[in-house]
Amino acid sequence: MSEQSRCPVTGRTADSPATGSGLSNRDWWPNQLHLDMLHQHSSLVNPMGEGFRYKEEFGKLDLKEVKKDLYALMTDSQEWWPADYGHYGGLFIRMAWHSAGTYRTSDGRGGGGTGNQRFAPLNSWPDNANLDKARRLLWPIKQKYGKKISWADLMILAGNCALESMGFKTFGFGGGRVDIWEPEEDIYWGKEVEWLGNKRYSGERDLENPLAAVQMGLIYVNPEGPDGKPDPVAAGRDIRETFARMAMNDEETVALVAGGHTFGKCHGVGDPKLVGPEPEAADIEEQGLGWKSGYGIGKGDETMTSGLEGAWTPDPIHWDMGYLGMLFRYEWELTKSPAGAWQWKPKDVAEEDLAPAAHDPSKRVPTMMTTADLAMRMDPIYGPISQRYYEHPDQFADAFARAWFKLTHRDMGPHSRYLGAEVPAEELIWQDPVPALDHDLIDAEEIAELKKRLLASGLSIPELVSTAWASASTFRGSDKRGGANGARIRLAPQKDWEVNQPEQLQRVLHKLEEIRNTFNGEQSGNKQVSLADMIVLGGCAAVEEAAGKAGTGVTVPFTPGRTDALQEQTDTESFSVLEPLADGFRNYMKKKYSVSAEEMLVDRSQLLTLTAPEMTVLLGGLRVLGANFQQSPHGVFTTQPETLTNDYFVNLLDMGTEWKPLSKEQDTFEGRDRKTGEPRWTATRVDLIFGSNSRLRAIAEVYGSDDAQEKFVHDFVAAWDKVMNLDRFDLG
């Protein structure tokens, strides 16, 4: 081969594969534990730098000016992608809705909080067709305000401004969404390998957890009906399941569908085969835009998007009762769009109920409804709600405003995280409110005194540790729910969860309450300590005591300031999704699952925002502290229980132990002395993965070394402190 064909630096030829190409480890070993999800979104991929503080930058933003620019954009139709009816409102509502609408309650993942619609796979989902144009239309505004407003905030704000510019009064807007710079590794979107696949169902029509959408690449349901079959009643069942998994009840669902479909139109005037590839598959010269259509001019009245065609209302750019009016005033007959999609047309429609053509106001065209829309009338539950909204427009407007606000803010956590002048004063129950701090905080001397009382109370180290862990470890970094603040572990439903060992929990809480009441009664002035703080402080005191027993003196950080929520501030149904199906840190599995215990451990660790080293040191420490569910001996690799030693790692890595499964499911194991055959330990998959997985074993070796005891304790304390404070947004 000629030297001209070789790279002068690497010596590679023109036929050599690119660096980083070829099979990955996961290609070779598909069942390999997916630890990469614990190390996402690092400073290495973030161009903003480690010192960037979005909250500070957003505080410099003139929100009124941004909104003024967004209002102007709504009617500034661009030749490269002209606005339907001269107004981009419908497009931006869809963009904001589809940004927020990926949220699901089961794991809190998805939603509009990260700006992930910019990246694959979402930027190329079939349901997001042509939303790439919406984001490009926003670019001049993003460019103008730069780091002061994130893409995530701008997309939601654009949806609000679209509604307001068409005459609707929104409930408010809270900023504070921080952009990510790479696609998430932790979100499971489904097992399908083709767009619109639906292998997510089993049985009659049981949708796989944690999924909410009915098909791969859809945000909600198939608008043509289940699996494309135009059955409005069956569609209603799909809609109810899907919206419930996205935190919406029946009234909110009707309000969102009817309110959102008051605006804009669907696009399906030609052959869908003429539509080009999605953004991630498009040619480089398309510069990140996809779905280039070969039908006509490919835009305007010849746009292809969903395959459905037409507006829902006669006036698609103004807030009115047009959607519900059309839904109830007409009978509907099944038809197909020009693109071949099932939809419905009104029978004997009056002239005044025709809509203008989107790009030629001199023409009048029929409106349409999708099968999903007709479910709002024909479903036995949705129908009466729709009728009530139709008869009470003010009630409908309020319901839509509140449901839209919930849709676009559900994944942001508590009210205290919202930024900006348009944050509503009203706290809503789905924001998991906690009372405002109304007392003076305990100081270092009083903290030390309370620790003494806790350790002298008769409560054991395992009881104090496991109670604090149970309270704090409900936190989910995905939607910022859960955590120790509020002491909701004493309320329904958490007090009754099996994993929390209710009988033991009540005994521990009673003793903590007793110590708290005695202390508070001794105070003069306004100084108090909350039960939420007592729960965490008890765990901290126990960790300190256990470290001292191991000969490693340490002070576990503790910051008071938590308050105690009331039962009426706690939506029991909403909180039920926080119940752990498995908690590897306590060696707990509610039942057998198709997903392995070690995978569930990594998933839980990711929700707790833990890295692999933090996960490792926490689990090893909690084992020797005796925090296992029902005091199980599995994984307690120590002869000095309740002592914070690195024994877990020393004994796990001991080649003198040979492990054998105790069950055909290979979920529990026994370790015997390799020479004598004498039993030494028992363990679960969650324990043995730290010796089996090469990456986790490498970390375990750090903590199992002869010189590692002090590092182990300090790393455990740091990780413990992190978990105890995950929901302390007041600490910055």
UniProtKB/Swiss-Prot annotation:
| Heme listed as a keyword | yes
What's in the GO CC field? cytosol
Q: Which InterPro entries match?
A: Catalase_peroxidase, Haem_peroxidase, Haem_peroxidase_sf, Peroxidases_AS, Peroxidases_heam-ligand_BS
Q: Does the keyword Metal-binding apply?
A: yes
Q: Where is this site: Transition state stabilizer?
A: R94
Sites of the Tryptophyl-tyrosyl-methioninium (Tyr-Met) (with W-97) crosslink: Y220-M246
Query: Crosslink site(s) for Tryptophyl-tyrosyl-methioninium (Trp-Tyr) (with M-246)?
Result: W97-Y220
> Where do the catalytic residues lie?
H98
**Modification note:** Formation of the three residue Trp-Tyr-Met cross-link is important for the catalase, but not the peroxidase activity of the enzyme.
Q: Which cofactor does it need?
A: heme b
Kindly state what the record says about how the cofactor is bound.
Binds 1 heme b (iron(II)-protoporphyrin IX) group per dimer.
- Annotated CDD domains: catalase_peroxidase_1, catalase_peroxidase_2
* Chain positions covered by the region annotation Disordered: 1-23
Tree of life domain: Bacteria
**Binding-site residues, heme b:** H261
Molecular function GO labels: catalase activity; heme binding; metal ion binding
Under Enzyme Commission nomenclature, its number is 1.11.1.21
Q: Which residues cross the membrane?
A: none
Catalysed transformations (reactions):
H2O2 + AH2 = A + 2 H2O; 2 H2O2 = O2 + 2 H2O
Function field: Bifunctional enzyme with both catalase and broad-spectrum peroxidase activity.
**What family name appears in the similarity comment?**
Belongs to the peroxidase family. Peroxidase/catalase subfamily.
On assembly, the entry states: Homodimer or homotetramer.
Name of protein: Catalase-peroxidase
Q: Which organism is it from?
A: Prosthecochloris aestuarii (strain DSM 271 / SK 413)
Biological classification of the source:
Bacteria, Pseudomonadati, Chlorobiota, Chlorobiia, Chlorobiales
Q: Which gene encodes it?
A: katG
